[in-house]
């Protein structure tokens, strides 16, 4: 992470979960605290709008390796600088299994998308449908007045629908679910005791005509 932001065990995951646009890598001196040592070098990277934790992890691994080489060169050359972190920091604690369950009553479409991205490929965000555990691996978030969404749902009036209600489940058009603010479209999904697959293949074998995720 870009210290002192996200000290702790899961900085990459929390950057994605929180919908951050920028993260990065920091090299530092070790001390007695968790990620509290003086900083040496930093490198920023943009986080893609649809980028998952796994994808970002791979990019940062390469960047981190290159930054480490530069850091070691500076130490060897005697040009290294120590930069104190200061007290303006945030913590990135370990993820809990409980946070993987989607809370439809509190999270809007963008927050659910960030949850799905942040827990991919670790754990996977999930919900229950008809008592079965369904994992979401890739979703899109729409505002309710989005033109592209309107082309799919037509003139559907879903003002009386509750968060978690299925608006459309069609193997060709997709799976659309209402949230407290906005709509998500599920693109990659995993049924209970099944493998990950695109939503079209899933809907050809799993009937979701009406009902709600909870």
Task: Identify the function of each model-found stretch.
Residues 1-92, 96-98:
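Donor/substrate-binding cores of folate-linked one-carbon enzymes
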Residues 103-214:
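An anion-binding loop in the catalytic cleft
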């Amino acid at each position: 992470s870009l210290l002192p932001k996200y000290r702790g065990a899961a900085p990459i995951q929390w950057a994605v979960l929180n919908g951050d646009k920028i993260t990065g890598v920091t090299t530092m001196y070790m001390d007695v605290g968790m990620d509290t040592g003086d900083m040496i070098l930093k490198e920023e990277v943009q986080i893609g709008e649809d980028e998952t934790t796994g994808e970002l992890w791979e990019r940062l691994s390469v960047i981190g390796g290159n930054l480490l080489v530069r850091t070691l060169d500076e130490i060897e050359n005697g040009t290294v600088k120590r930069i104190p972190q200061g007290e303006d920091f945030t913590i990135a604690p370990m993820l809990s299994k409980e946070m993987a369950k989607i809370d439809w009553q509190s999270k809007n479409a963008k927050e659910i998308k960030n949850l799905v991205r942040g827990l991919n490929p670790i754990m996977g965000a999930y919900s229950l449908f008809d008592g079965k555990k369904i994992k979401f691996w890739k979703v899109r978030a729409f505002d309710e007045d989005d033109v592209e969404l309107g082309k799919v749902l037509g003139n559907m009036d879903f003002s009386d629908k509750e968060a978690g209600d299925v608006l459309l489940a069609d193997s060709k058009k997709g799976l659309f679910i209402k949230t407290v603010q906005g709509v998500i479209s599920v693109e990659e999904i995993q049924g209970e005791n099944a493998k990950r697959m695109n939503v079209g293949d899933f809907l050809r074998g799993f009937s979701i005509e009406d009902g709600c995720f909870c």
